[in-house]
């Protein structure tokens, strides 16, 4: 994922405790998990990654994938980019993988070919300008915008980044000709990857620094949190922020299914180690029996990795694994 490569360069330049990053158009979540891994490797537990997806149906997919990834420092929202304008200088890095005319997806998705037209290119270019202008106040002076599309059109790529630098105020980071041997092309303002010349689908990525002075130091409330609350941006309600340990029912704490997957899980439940066959059966929601394991809530694991919880009753157990994540294919 080349956008992740460019992001890691920005992280190397600006990375510090308390860093805030916005993944503006984040669904389905592959980019978010890549960013989260890079942030955790560089900063440990001291960062916040806000992953946003304006489309409600896609935001639910994003939220579920973030839950499976298990990093409690990732917050998921579903708002229009304009909603972030009220939070002046809130983010150190903004990654904007914006909606585009989709030429880089032609090989993968026949619908992208059917929907393409010159008019679509112009409409997308205008929409991308609107998105960048809307979110621009939320990027702090000296912060970095990583801008990407999955198209080859100059109007949506180099020209739009040049427009942002000129009209919004910034300096384009000169792209590097790093991987020509792997088919990565150099353009005026970024790098172009064409489907058929590189593994995967087409992509264009560029970056710019917002004009102004970058001032290190933590503003009030910038510390990344790992509990579930209303989030660090008042007025924007998160779909997901941290993972609750569970919910109380009948005087008993029922563990949240996602808690087992979270990096915040402290291992307070007895562990049951599964064979590969048992692990598949658990994910397939087949009946399982653990007569020799402790009664009550247990965390089931495969090769040391938590998969979820069961309520072990001895001769049978009730799974807490979400039905929406059940393996549907025949596992035999």
Residue ranges of model-derived segments:
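Class I S-adenosyl-L-methionine
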Residues: 91, 144-147, 151-237
């Amino acid at each position: 994922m080349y956008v992740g490569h460019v992001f890691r360069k920005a992280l190397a330049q600006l990375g510090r405790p308390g860093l805030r990053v916005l993944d503006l158009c984040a669904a389905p979540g592959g980019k978010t998990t890549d960013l989260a891994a890079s942030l955790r490797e560089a900063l440990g537990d001291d960062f916040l990654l806000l992953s946003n997806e304006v489309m409600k149906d896609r935001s639910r997919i994003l939220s579920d994938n973030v839950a499976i990834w298990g990093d409690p420092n990732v917050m998921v929202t579903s708002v229009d980019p304009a909603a972030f304008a009220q939070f002046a200088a809130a983010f150190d890095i903004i990654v904007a993988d914006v909606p585009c005319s989709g030429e880089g997806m032609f090989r993968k998705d026949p619908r992208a070919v059917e929907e393409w037209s010159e008019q679509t290119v112009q409409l997308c270019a205008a929409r991308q300008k609107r998105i960048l202008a809307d979110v621009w106040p939320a990027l702090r002076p000296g912060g970095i915008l990583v801008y990407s599309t999955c198209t080859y059109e100059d109007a949506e790529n180099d020209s739009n980044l040049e427009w942002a630098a000129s009209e919004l105020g910034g300096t384009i980071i000169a792209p590097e000709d790093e991987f020509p041997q792997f088919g990565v092309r150099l353009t005026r303002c970024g790098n172009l990857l064409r489907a058929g010349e590189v593994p995967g689908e087409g992509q264009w990525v560029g970056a710019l620094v917002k004009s102004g002075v970058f001032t290190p130091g933590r503003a009030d409330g910038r510390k990344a949190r790992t509990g579930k609350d209303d989030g660090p941006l008042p007025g924007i309600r998160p779909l997901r922020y941290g993972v609750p340990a569970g919910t109380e029912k009948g005087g008993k704490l029922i563990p949240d299914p996602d808690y087992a997957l979270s990096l915040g899980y402290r291992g307070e439940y007895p562990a049951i180690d599964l064979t590969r066959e048992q692990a598949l059966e658990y994910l397939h929601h087949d009946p399982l029996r653990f007569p020799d394991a402790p009664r009550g809530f247990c965390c089931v694991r495969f090769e040391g990795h938590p998969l979820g919880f069961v309520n072990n009753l001895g001769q049978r157990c009730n799974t807490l694994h979400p039905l929406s994540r059940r393996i549907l294919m025949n596992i035999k």
